[in-house]
Structure formats: C-alpha cells, structure tokens
Amino acid sequence: MANLYDLKKFDLNLLVIFECIYQHLSISKAAESLYITPSAVSQSLQRLRAQFNDPLFIRSGKGIAPTTTGLNLHHHLEKNLRGLEQTINIVNKSELKKNFIIYGPQLISCSNNSMLIRCLRQDSSVEIECHDILMSAENAEELLVHRKADLVITQMPVISRSVICMPLHTIRNTLICSNRHPRITDNSTYEQIMAEEFTQLISKSAGVDDIQMEIDERFMNRKISFRGSSLLTIINSIAVTDLLGIVPYELYNSYRDFLNLKEIKLEHPLPSIKLYISYNKSSLNNLVFSRFIDRLNESF
C-alpha cells in the first residue's frame, strides 16, 4: 500500500511538469504544451531539483539533456503516469472523447482517406472532423502536442518522443490532359508535350517541394500558365482547357470519366508521394482510439 502521508507532502503536479520537460527537452515547449508560463515551469523544476538533490537537466549545446537521475526518474515515471491515466480513463469511460479531428492534405481525399473513415466509422458513435490542410512535420507536431488534432497526415515523417508516426500510403503521380485536347495523342513525343502549357500546385510543404524539384528536372523550362493551391481546381481547369498537369493517379482515376480526362503515357514514371500518419502516444490510452489503430493496422 502507498504511503499516503508521504505522497501528501509531495506535489505530484511537479512530476507531470518534469515528464513534459523530458519529452520536449525544452522549458518553453513544455510550457506551451501545458498552457503555463516558462517561468512557472522553471520554478517547478527548481522545486524538483531541491527535492531530489540533483539538477535533473543540464545544458547541452543549444538545448538541455537529462542527467542520470533524470533518466532514471523518467524510466519509472513514464509507466506510472500512463497507468494513472489509464485508471482515470477507465473510471470516466462514458466520457471518453469520441470526436476525432483529422488534419491532412487534399491528397488523402483521393487515396486512403476512405480506409481511415471506414475504420473510424466502425464505431457508429464516433464523430469525424476533417481539415484539408497541407502542413510541415513541425506544424503537425505542434497540433498534436497542443491536442488540436487526433490524427495528422503529412508528406514528411513527424519525429517526436511523444508522437507515433508510421507510413500510410504511397501516391503515384500521372500527367493528364483533356480527352478533347487538339494536339496531345497516345503517340505524342516528349518535344510535343514540352510545347504545351502546364499547371502547378502551389505549396510550401517540404514534401511537395521535393517532388516539384524532381518534376522541374524532368520537364525543364516547361511553361507554367496556371497555378493553384487546390488539386480539384487544377483538375477542373485541365478539363476545360488545353493545359497539361501532374496530379495523383487516384484523383485522376476518380474524375476521368466525369471530366473527360486522359492520361499521357510517359517513358519513365513520375516521382511518387509518401504519406505518413501521426498521433500522440497517450491517445492509445483512449479505448476508442486504440481500437481504431488496431483496425487501421489490420487494413494495411
């Protein structure tokens, strides 16, 4: 049995703050995730240092690193805090969150999005809110840390102590044009293709930038006559003009009959896009969420 008198003398909130500092290795980021000031985090760390008679963290380069005592404390604390959180969730099982917020690029609407939604909706009580936003891995981590999203889909892996990230899907790109294009045929040469005007997706995402650099090398000095931040806008513009564009194959396949589009065959395949799905490790303590992840893993 725990010594409740000794526990009463110790502020258990300090251990939560310690674990948050350990996860981020940053006073300021720990403060952001806990919605308190960096000063409050620093004061709590000072109290812990006095309690354990150890600095717990020391400066390392531009950041901080845990001492051996800090490492040992985290080793034991992580399991105990997870167990405490699971106990609270079990007691409040009826109040567990069942509204899932997903952030991801428009690309998911034409790939494995249906699989995600299907896995979530196997629990009929789940409500889903989906935001079509292309973001960096850093912004994705911030959304997860601040609990503003349950699932985030990115084109670059999210690397964080508190986040689980895994590959979701690889999207093949293809070059398309209108089925009524007056010059492009199945036998069009590279030179004939390069004589046409192209569309381009506007994006600041590192993943898209890398792909566009490869495409720029492949179609060097091509003329870009239409730029847009929406894939649906781009594909609709291609359908009603003589423009050529590079879009995800699944998107083309979904709309080719309705919009009278055709694929332009190339000698070598275009670069593909990898998608990653990320979520907080602590979310697995939620029974509804953990079951969803199990279903998702079974679908791969």
UniProtKB/Swiss-Prot annotation:
Source superkingdom: Bacteria
UniProt entry tagged with the keyword Transcription: yes
Chain residues forming the annotated DNA-binding region: 27-46
GO MF term (any one): DNA-binding transcription factor activity
Pfam families the UniProt entry points to: HTH_1, LysR_substrate
Inducing or repressing factors: Induced by LeuO, a monocistronic operon. Maximally induced in early stationary phase, repressed by H-NS via 2 binding sites in the upstream and coding region; H-NS may bind both regions to form a bridge which then prevents transcription.
TM regions (residue ranges): none
This protein's record includes keyword Cytoplasm: no
InterPro entries tied to this protein: LysR-type_TF, LysR_subst-bd, Tscrpt_reg_HTH_LysR, WH-like_DNA-bd_sf, WH_DNA-bd_sf
Protein family per UniProt: Belongs to the LysR transcriptional regulatory family.
Note: The protein is quite variable across different genetic subgroups, probably due to its binding and repression by H-NS.
Name of the protein in question: Uncharacterized HTH-type transcriptional regulator YbdO
Organismal lineage: Bacteria, Pseudomonadati, Pseudomonadota, Gammaproteobacteria, Enterobacterales
